[in-house]
Amino acid sequence: MKKMIKRTGSCICGQIKFSVNLDEVPRVYNCHCVDCRKKTGCGFITVIELREGALEIDKNKLAIYKHPGGSGKEIRKNFCKNCFAPVYSHVERWQKIYLYAGLLDDVEILKTSKNINFEKSHFPIFELKEKGVKI
């Protein structure tokens, strides 16, 4: 059985507070896809892939935006209703939750990450040595 580590986090205004049970070595991705870039206005986002039931959060304080992803399956983006900070996305294609890593109070556990760049969708200013992970 894998060791789990409990961490807490919040959005910038503090209305969204959560706790999350992470694997001892969490799966952390830097996603360079067009969808993630447009969602944040940044070159990529850093997310943590969560197991089902790992996130404890008051969903009543979240706003949800739904849209089809590149596969045609639904993506649900969850934001704070007050400050509009992105909190997590649920990707139907993989039945996974991806928590925005920057919301954690303590990021010390996040020691390694993999780039998901969907080949030619990353910014040319980011020199990516690996080909990217197919998930």
Task: Go through the PLM ranges and name each one.
Residues 1-10, 15-135:
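A short Gly-Trp-Pro
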